[in-house]
């Protein structure tokens, strides 16, 4: 007799995707006893068994499986509504956690004879198991929806294969990702959906194929898809190991390969192979051993969540070896275990925006349609019923809008939960709308049938669900998505938006519908609160949308309003105002430094450096998307964040942004340190005085030296000593009122440097004081003995008239106005310099063009 845990199936149960879970001391006889044959036909069979040494061990596995699958168990029955592969993986995980030895048998047939029919001794109905040990294995409905979404792709859609091409951005992503891996051992590639992350991963892992590589994916279908792509790229199957619970053989041309979940075989293969590529599901990752040179985590936002060991976090939290590459379109930052943790995830080494993919032609474009709240003929008695009736009408309005351009549109409706999906479905069907519903509590065959019906429909059709098709499932013909409930997670929002963005020949733009509690009679900013998280998420992926929010008259965007009886333009203006300033309408949320689109702001910084040959000045302005901004504010934020990053402190900058900055000329010296470096200038001053017999000769403390990257040492020293002269003994404020004890404003260390250097030559650099205040007349003019700096400035002014050769040698371009305008002459004359930012007391801001003919370019 053989004891064991089993999962059995009967055609009557299989039709409902139900599977019988049990344990027995006699696997050969179990399916032939009365409890199986009295009410069912003789068609029972095992899906799989875990043979154990004792019946008690088998009972513990059963109890553990039923505990972990509690959300998918039929009440008071040992029936579970999960895929057999899912139950198998769960059973093995339970057995491993409980330290129970077993032998896995797939679809076994045990020989039945008279000797096998034995009355089994009864065991306590509730064996003692450590639920704490198994808590991380509990399957939640949300997790299963995502898992099912991964698997349904394989059964339901065929991906269109295209010729292999290395796009320019893919090469750049691979290079930057690999360099970051070599630098820090961890890197994130954030690339929009459908933009070729797998190809980039292949280009990177090619550098590690002499060793061992692990490629983790969140589901069986993605495992197959990843294998197919890597095979297409040139990976040989002889050095590939697939770890997953689907035993179906995969055939690729003349090659074939199978998955496995045999822990002994897996460990032996990994340890003994000199080179190996392992492709595994996160769910099977507990079977792996820590011996990889590179670990790639695809769709890595799935790892985030609670800080606990579970299949999705097993490798991240427990493996110590190897570099880590994380791939995602939507990083997750809102959970205890999040991608903000740079020790675990590293930083973003490369980013490719959704808008870039659209403009390059790899992703379908889309329009936004906000849907006004319609008036109800009869007011329901409850708020919940009112909301439901309004959303139903808004869904019908959205479908009608699609039908004006598309014969048989398909629309996904994302709901708050399964309860809302059921309620909306019932109401839509009652009103004659062709609607379908799919969610994780339905039998799998029903879901697949519904999904197939939706995909193949030749009529306008709606499919309601909560999270089932939020990501992973591709519907090439999908035309629109409708958010029946607000979403707050940027990840959820962007993944949902991307569902209808498959690129197909002659496919019209997709539509994203956002229902609002707004009509022409109840317009107020609070009514727009539900779209603010949506707008924030979209603006981070689509710089054009961000610019449109700042100035719609200059930057067009496909956004409109349906169901409004008033002025659509006024309603859109209110919506944009709520998004930009919040529902209180007070603070400009979009122009904070960290919100400015990096590519646009960095492009202006790069232009200033490469064209103007300098870094930004304090009063440089920036005109972006209709906003008048002081560029120095963003520039200072960048420097602060850069220094935090280099000091390994929490920083807002990602590695790819740091790489951008360090690509600029003299970034670490002039960009971070400023145009007038103190130590460098003091070294030059000390050498100069030694070579010129202690004479400063001439110095310009009026124009402030020259801030350009090509500045001479004397020009930089002029800037430093201009600052010293301005700070030395400033005792008056702007309104000429005395400010006691605020006289000497030079930092002590810098004062010591000046004392030491000038003191060697008995030169006086400090201004005279009386009782701590400068010697000044009633008009604030200095009346003390001139300092060596002031005397050198007098000489400079004389040399401008009498010794122009000397001036040109040490202050080249002075005669052409370079120092006066702090711009290269040709930059000034052609108006290429950044505009000057000016703020007025009334709150208005102005950018004034720097050129021979000053003119306002923006009020």
UniProtKB/Swiss-Prot annotation:
On the tree of life, the source organism's domain of life is Viruses
Q: In its keyword annotation, does this UniProt entry include Nucleotide-binding?
A: yes
UniProt-listed PROSITE patterns: HELICASE_ATP_BIND_1 (PS51192), HELICASE_CTER (PS51194)
- Sequence motif DEAH box, location on chain: 298-301
Task: Report the EC number(s), separated by commas if there are several.
Answer: 3.6.4.-
Alphabetically sorted, this entry's keywords are:
ATP-binding, Helicase, Hydrolase, Nucleotide-binding
* SUPFAM superfamilies listed in its UniProt record: P-loop containing nucleoside triphosphate hydrolases
By its UniProt entry, which SMART domains does this protein fall under?
DEXDc
User: What is the name of the protein in this document?
Assistant: Probable helicase A859L
